[in-house]
Structures are given as structure tokens and as C-alpha cells.
From Swiss-Prot:
One of its GO terms (molecular function) is N-acyltransferase activity. It is a multi-pass membrane protein. The keyword Transmembrane applies. This is Apolipoprotein N-acyltransferase. NCBIfam families: lnt (TIGR00546). Its EC number is 2.3.1.269. Catalyzes the phospholipid dependent N-acylation of the N-terminal cysteine of apolipoprotein, the last step in lipoprotein maturation. Disulfide bonds: none annotated. The chain crosses the membrane at residues 18-38, 50-70, 82-102, 105-125, 156-176, 182-202, 476-496. GO terms for biological process: lipoprotein biosynthetic process. Residues 217-461 form the CN hydrolase domain. The active site is at residues 257, 320, 372. It comes from Wigglesworthia glossinidia brevipalpis.
């Protein structure tokens, strides 16, 4: 029983390493606890169970706030909302369980190799699986804890997954020091931090002379109001009012996801009208909207204004690729659809865009866009960044989750994308956090949550491609796979020798 509560406790501890708490050492302590309780357990099955319980403590505390949207907007009572969160947490807990099984089976001996190579390689593989299987859900990899920590300088080189790799090594060295009663592993940790900390002051980019005035509008429209068809005109007027106030002082105006609460066809007259006004002022508007293409609906980003006339089939458009499971896309549709129909739940089923898409072209600026939680898929973002990319853009609607910690977690993961790519990131969110993030991941300016306001800044383009944009996770993933292939053959050899 003590081991069960210990596993849950250490898993729960991890959440305070992320925003809004930002106590980054908590992730090291949390992983230290996971490694201690599983390496101290000689039975593989029992170790896997403890890994699963650590995952429950970790993921339930990290994503509990999803119940707000399930309860308030889908009409599911609180009890069943919590059950759904537990089921999702249980699914996500399979990945730390895989991590424990891999380390226990392939690296049974408690030594330097286990904690410096075996455990971090196993973690890398389990996290890659979490980001790929089904729709993928790489929410809060432990590397995100370092956005304000001493290892953040590694992000432009090895990305958030690489930082996670290093954190597993550091936690592992703490465990090794505990078991061996030796200070040498601690010296190794000091060596790692001493070696990597100066990277925090190194710039992988240079600032161009090219800049533009950008305005980000935060409408702060409640989700209840947004889904009310009688409020559509009022919501649009709210955004128009602020837009007219700043149109003379900004070149690019950005509205968030769901700013236009109707599809592109239904709002065509409104779009043509505002497009005309923008052209007179020689400004651009970038906004989220639902688009219809070949009988399929897409969550998309469109551009208005500029030199070309507005067309609903314009190529200067973006279609969301990573759709939110259950919110925008029903996974395992053939199995789950009949169940949801019996429960009387009608879910949206959008079509996803292509993995690779053109950058948005605004004046002579090239912008890599993303919508909502797509910003957590760092590998896809970096694959769409080109040598001529000027900015990253993400638009979101976090009003589904109220004043919980969810929007803050989301915001800090966006900061990591700016740091990994060396690009300014523009973030417009319906109710916050609307902000401009610098190419070093630092906050340039932001609006408070839950206000109806705008952010107006001159933003400079940056030049340069970081090592992470070039190579991604490939070097570390390749190394991890090679480690397991070698370990597998060693394991087979030992079995034969034993027999």
C-alpha cells in the first residue's frame, strides 16, 4: 500500500514543474521517485504496475481541467466527467508503463549504463509513441519544465524531447548516488549543467532589419455565447470594433481561433465587406474560421485584405492537421460512434489538412501557422519551418477550460516552439493568453486573461535555422533504437549461454 501511494505521490508532484507553478526541480524529483520505486522492485509485473500508478498520478493532475469542457459544454455530469478523465489518464499511463518494462527487461542491473543510456533511451521511445499512436497526445513532456530552467539552452539543439532525455539522466544519476552512496554521479550532474548552461546565452538566429506592426486581438467571448447562434452578429461586432480602432496603426491584424463563429460560406458577405475595408487601409487580417471544401468541414485560418481579392478557395490558407480527439475528430470511429449515438452525444467530425502546407504569405513575410493544441506537436512545426520563415503563428480558443491551469500549460508549450526554432511566435487566444514570444522563448508582451483588448507591437523577423529544425529528434531516436537492438542481442546471447 505504501508503494502505491508513493507512486501516486511522485507522479502527482510532476505537475508543479510546469506553468503556472514553474518549479522546475519537481520534474527531476518526480522521475527520481519513479526510478527508485521501480528499480527497487525485483518483479517486472509489479514494477510495471508502479509505473502505471505513477502515470495516473502524473496525468490526472496534469489534465484534470478537461472535465470543465466535458461537464459544462458537453452536458456530462461531474461523476462521469471524472471517470472520463481517469480513463484518459489510464491510457496515457501506458507509456510510462512501457518505459518501466523496457528498462527492467533490457537493463536489469543498477549501474551507470542503465541511468545514462538505458533509461533515457527507453523514455525517448515511450514519448515518441505517445506523440504518434492514435491521434498522438504529447502534452507536457517533462522537458517543458525547463522553459525557465537551466537546460533551456538545449532546446534549439535537441528540442523538448532531447531535454527530457537529459532530465532522465540527471534523475538517474541521483538514484545511482542514492544506491551506491557515492558523490561521483552528483559530480556528473554538475558537469552536465556546467556544460549546457552557457548555451542559454547563445543565439542561433540573427535579427533582420525587416519588421512590421502586428496587432493581436483578444475578444474574450465566453464559450456559452460563442455556441449561441443568436449571438453571432454581436460577437463579430465585438471584434470589428477593436479592429477599426487599430487598423490605421497596424499592418497585420490577428483574430484568434473561433473568432468568426460561423462557416466561411455562411459569413461570405461579412468577409467580403471586411476584406474591402482592409484593402483601403492596406492591412491584412488573419483569422480562424470553419471552412467548407468538397463537402468536408475544416478548422482553418484565412487571410483577408492585401492585394488579391478574397476567395474561399484561396491558396493563402491553412487547414488544421492535428485535430483534437473527441472535440474535433472521433478516433476509432467505427467502434465509438455507435456508443456515442446511444448516449445521445453528437460530436463534430472535421476533416484534417495536409501534414506539409504552404506558409501564409502576408506582404513579404512568411508565417508558419498552427491552430490550438497543434502547437504541442514540435516535430511537425519544425518540419514546416523553412529557411525563409519569418514568424510562427498560433491561434487558440482556451475558453473551454475556464480559469484552470490548462491555458497556462498550453501557453508555455508555445514558448518552447519559439525557442526550438529561433522564431518570434505570435499567439492570439480568445480569452488568453494572448502574447508575443521572442525567438529565445522569453515573453515580449502579453495581455491579461479574460479581458477584451488588443496587443500592438513592432515585430522583427529573424534569420537562421537551428540544429533542432534541421535534424529534430532523429539523432537521439536513432541512438536510442541502436541501444535497444544491441541490448536485445546481448539478452538473447545470455539466454543461450544460460541454457
Amino acid at each position: 500500500m505504501i508503494k502505491i501511494f508513493t507512486a501516486l505521490f511522485f507522479g502527482s508532484l510532476n505537475v508543479i514543474s510546469f506553468s503556472p507553478y514553474n518549479f522546475w526541480p519537481a520534474s527531476i524529483i518526480s522521475i527520481f521517485g519513479l526510478l527508485i520505486i521501480t528499480t527497487n522492485c525485483k518483479n517486472l509485473i509489479n514494477s510495471a504496475k508502479l509505473g502505471f500508478l505513477w502515470g495516473i498520478g502524473n496525468f490526472f493532475n496534469e489534465i484534470y481541467w478537461i472535465y470543465i469542457s466535458i461537464n459544462k459544454f458537453f452536458g456530462i455530469n461531474l461523476f462521469f466527467s471524472i471517470i472520463i478523465i481517469l480513463l484518459l489518464s489510464s491510457y496515457l499511463s501506458l507509456y510510462p508503463t512501457i518505459f518501466v518494462i523496457l528498462t527492467k527487461f533490457f537493463f536489469p542491473k543498477i549501474n551507470f549504463f542503465l541511468f545514462c543510456v538505458g533509461a533515457p533511451s527507453a523514455w525517448m521511445i515511450s514519448e515518441i509513441l505517445r506523440s504518434k499512436i492514435l491521434t498522438g497526445f504529447p502534452w507536457l513532456e517533462i522537458g517543458y519544465s525547463q522553459i525557465n530552467g537551466p537546460l533551456k539552452g538545449l532546446a534549439p539543439i535537441i528540442g523538448v524531447s532531447g531535454i527530457s532525455y537529459i532530465l532522465i539522466i540527471i534523475s538517474g544519476m541521483c538514484v545511482l548516488s542514492f544506491y551506491k552512496k557515492s558523490y561521483y554521479p552528483i559530480i556528473f550532474i554538475i558537469f552536465i549543467i556546467t556544460l549546457t548552461y552557457p548555451l542559454n546565452f547563445f543565439k542561433w538566429y540573427s535579427v533582420k532589419e525587416k519588421s512590421t506592426k502586428i496587432a493581436l486581438i483578444q475578444g474574450n467571448i465566453s464559450q456559452h455565447t460563442y455556441i449561441d447562434n443568436n449571438q453571432i452578429q454581436k460577437n463579430l461586432e465585438q471584434y470589428l470594433k477593436i479592429t477599426k480602432k487599430i487598423i490605421n496603426s497596424s499592418n497585420i491584424i490577428i483574430w484568434p481561433e473561433s473568432a468568426i463563429p460561423c462557416d466561411e460560406i455562411s459569413c461570405r458577405n461579412f468577409l467580403l465587406k471586411i476584406d474591402k475595408e482592409l484593402k483601403l487601409k492596406k492591412s491584412y487580417l488573419i483569422t480562424g474560421i470553419i471552412s467548407l471544401k468538397k463537402s468536408n468541414y475544416y478548422n482553418s485560418i484565412i487571410t483577408l485584405g492585401g492585394n488579391s481579392p478574397y476567395l474561399d478557395n484561396s491558396k493563402n490558407k491553412y487547414y488544421k492537421y492535428n485535430l483534437v480527439p473527441f472535440g474535433e475528430k472521433l478516433p476509432l470511429k467505427s467502434i465509438l460512434n455507435p456508443i456515442f449515438n446511444k448516449l445521445g452525444l453528437s460530436l463534430i467530425d472535421l476533416k484534417k489538412g495536409d501534414f506539409f502546407q504552404n506558409q501564409l504569405k502576408i506582404f513579404d513575410f512568411n508565417i508558419v501557422p498552427s491552430i490550438c493544441y497543434e502547437i504541442i506537436f514540435g516535430d511537425r512545426i519544425r518540419k514546416n519551418v523553412k529557411i525563409n520563415t519569418d514568424f510562427l503563428l498560433t491561434i487558440s480558443n482556451d475558453s473551454w477550460f475556464g480559469d484552470s491551469i490548462g491555458p497556462w500549460q498550453h501557453f508555455n508549450m508555445a514558448r518552447m516552439r519559439a525557442l526550438e526554432t529561433g522564431k518570434n511566435l505570435l499567439r492570439a487566444s480568445n480569452n488568453g493568453i494572448t502574447a508575443i514570444i521572442g525567438p529565445n522563448g522569453e515573453l515580449k508582451s502579453k495581455l491579461p486573461q479574460f479581458v477584451n483588448d488588443f496587443l500592438l507591437e513592432e515585430v522583427f523577423s529573424t534569420m537562421g535555422v537551428t540544429p533542432y529544425v534541421k535534424f529534430g529528434n532523429i539523432p537521439l531516436l536513432f541512438f536510442s533504437i541502436i541501444c535497444f537492438i544491441i541490448s536485445f542481442f546481448i539478452k538473447i546471447k545470455l539466454i543461450f549461454l544460460k541454457n
